[in-house]
């Protein structure tokens, strides 16, 4: 699950860079939402991995 969270975070960062840079101005809001959703998934996955090992 951590692997997929990292993959989706990278995709969201790329989409965010395109959206925030003005290349795809209409999708900037969607890119922002996806970025923060997948960032939250990354944090949750990291915490779950830490608690699972402890």
UniProtKB/Swiss-Prot annotation:
Membrane topology: Multi-pass membrane protein
HAMAP family in the cross-refs: UPF0391
Family: Belongs to the UPF0391 family.
Source species: Mesorhizobium japonicum (strain LMG 29417 / CECT 9101 / MAFF 303099)
Highest taxon of source: Bacteria
InterPro entries: DUF1328
Chain ranges passing through the membrane: 4-24, 30-50
GO cellular component terms listed in the entry, alphabetical order: plasma membrane
Any Pfam family: DUF1328
Protein name (record): UPF0391 membrane protein msr3702
Keyword Transmembrane helix part of the UniProt annotation: yes
Keywords, ordered alphabetically: Cell membrane, Membrane, Transmembrane, Transmembrane helix
Subcellular location: Cell membrane
């Amino acid at each position: 699950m951590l692997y997929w969270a990292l993959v989706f975070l990278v995709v969201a960062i790329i989409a965010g860079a395109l959206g925030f840079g003005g290349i795809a101005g209409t999708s900037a809001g969607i890119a922002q939402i996806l970025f923060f959703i997948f960032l939250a998934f990354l944090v949750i996955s990291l915490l779950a991995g830490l608690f699972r090992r402890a």
